[in-house]
């Protein structure tokens, strides 16, 4: 198992904190976010880590492979992810946003999740959003499951709070078969490569999943049918 940290974007929501550093080097609890992420990944047994940089990417140094998205200011997360296409082809990879913190046990749970693509979401998201925003609905995105455990909505703004069953937290796993689905989608619609973020990518399919309770977080494996592209 390998890991890819997507750290190309400016992190504009962090405002002045990223004026002189990439968002993954902003400090929390006495050390950079990137250090927390590497610690969690290593704690879950992942030794091979790749960081895709962009904005101030020359500042990224550490016990990892560094790649650069030269179009970081014109593209979104999918383009940064595909900078590490060879890693995705070679083995299942944990994909991490660069502006989040998580424990090793969350990564470990994700490693065990079934499916070609798997991700974690937070069922207790509302407590955190209430602390961050006067109006949690202004930032929250849709995340709904049907009675059979299938994702029916993800990543849409402006939905009623009572309909949201969790929030995707920026940590997922993609297998080589999951990459095949992504590439099949892009073969049909190559213009999506530059503009899709991760939730928009996932929202372009309907898929089955299995739910795995993990304290505040749930892990679920996405059983993607590569023959059925719903766009």
Please name every model-derived segment.
Residues 98-100:
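The conserved acidic donor/metal-binding loop of glycosyltransferases
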């Amino acid at each position: 198992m390998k890991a890819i940290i997507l750290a190309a974007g400016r992190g504009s929501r962090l405002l002045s904190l990223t004026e002189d550093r990439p968002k993954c080097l902003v400090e929390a609890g006495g050390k950079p976010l990137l250090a927390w992420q590497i610690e969690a990944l290593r704690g879950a047994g992942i030794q091979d880590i790749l960081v895709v940089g962009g904005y101030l990417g020359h500042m990224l140094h550490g016990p990892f492979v560094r790649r650069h998205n030269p179009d970081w200011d014109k593209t979104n997360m999918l383009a940064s992810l595909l900078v590490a296409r060879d890693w995705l082809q070679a083995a299942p990879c944990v994909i991490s946003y660069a502006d989040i913190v998580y424990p090793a046990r969350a990564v470990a749970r994700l490693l065990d999740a079934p499916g070609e693509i798997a991700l974690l979401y937070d069922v207790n998201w509302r407590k955190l959003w209430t602390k961050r925003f006067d109006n949690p609905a202004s930032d929250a995105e849709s995340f709904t499951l049907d009675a059979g455990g299938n994702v029916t909505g993800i990543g849409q703004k402006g939905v009623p709070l009572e309909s949201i069953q969790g929030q995707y937290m920026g940590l997922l796993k993609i297998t080589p078969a999951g990459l095949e689905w992504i590439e099949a989608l892009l073969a049909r619609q190559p213009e999506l490569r530059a503009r899709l973020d991760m939730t928009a990518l996932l929202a372009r399919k309907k898929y089955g999943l299995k739910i795995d309770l993990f304290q505040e977080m749930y892990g679920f494996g996405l059983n993607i049918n590569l023959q059925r592209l719903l766009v």
